[in-house]
Amino acid sequence: RQPGSTFKIIACYAPALDAGGKTLASVQDDAPFTVGNKTYNNYSHTFGGFTSIRKAITKSINIVTVKTLQDIGVDLGYEYAENFGFSTLTDTDRNLGISLGGLTQGVTNLELTAAYATIANQGEYNEPNFYTQVLDHDGNVLLDKTQIKEQRQVIKEDTAWLLTDAMKDVMTSGTGMRAYFGTGMAQAGKSGTTTLNRDALFAGFTPYYTCVVWGGYDDNSIQSATGYPKNLWKAVMKRIHADLKAKDFEKPSGITQAVVCAKSGLLPETDVCDKDPRGTQSYTEYFAEGTVPTENCDHHISLQICEASGKVAGEYCPADQVVTKTYIVGAEKGSADYQYCATEKFLNGTCNIHDAETQDEEKPEEEPADPPDDAKPEETHEPEQIPEKNEE
């Protein structure tokens, strides 16, 4: 069956982080997007603007996923999906739709579970088995599958941990909150649905177990609800972890941290990225060693704005009417960032209220200078007083 958004991790984000030069901080512009005759949409039918891969995983944002695969190349995504153990892929799946789980023949739940178990197993694939041994009543081994036939490293250990950390956010603040069973046990997962809710899935794991739940009809009928796979995942996983010690996923030594701007994935500009009108965009992200960005944010800009005109201040704008503001640059129309964007037209225009004439008009009249202290006062002469005649 179709794996829906659970395949975003497999065919897009795993190769993007492992070999595509991307990090969890890398951004794409979540805005209206069309390739050829195909227009892509998000489940929410909203567009968030510049969005990081971490957030795109957490909130299951389609457009960021498709643009990321477009960047790294469809062939790379297909190659990684094959290496994760999917045997049903065909050449017709070599298109951007693979990033959203749009596959010609779909996948089996067993192979999807094995792929997610690969991430949980620090990137190492183990061929799945339904049993390890079958014994007779005397304890003699009748069937033995303790030896794994196929074992290979699909993604780097660091990549597996980074994907896991992002999928932990899915459980606590994203599309998988309904599946989260608490108890202090670390949990990572990814939800998935297909067109008209014909398929509903939840794939996730803990430091102990991996579980994938698919729900749908044999005849591919439309479903009215898609949350029940999460409920089932939660019920099963909570029960089998009841007596297990709570623990987190072990972080590899090759993981480091750095402060970046959420709108560019690059190093924040001092007094710029933290002055975004929506609040500071600086946050701390995890990186594999050697992938921390070295360039500064290129999606924020600081401008001097004249309050009287609301435009870029010119040379004649009074200082007491000029303020510094932070804007987004490069945002596409239709996205949440666009209302905060300094467009090319805005950048090329300046204040049309203040000019040389208004500057002269606003100059106060000069007061006469006070005389110096040693200046002698000018002599004054009173007019002669002529005695009045006494008229009788």
Each language-model region and where it sits:
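Structural recognition of the beta-strand scaffold that forms the well-ordered cores
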Residues: 26-27, 55, 65-68, 80, ...
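Periplasmic/cell-envelope proteins involved in peptidoglycan metabolism and beta-lactam response
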Residues: 1, 23-26, 81, 94, ...
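Secondary-structure transition/capping motifs at alpha-helix termini
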Residues: 17-26, 87-89, 121-126, 243
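A penicillin-recognizing enzyme superfamily signal
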Residues: 106-299
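Intrinsically disordered, low-complexity repeat and linker tracts
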Residues: 145-147, 258-261, 271-273, 278-285, ...
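Conserved catalytic neighborhood of penicillin-recognizing serine enzymes
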Residues: 21-77, 125, 137-169
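Active-site SXXK
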Residues: 2-28, 56, 115-119, 163, ...
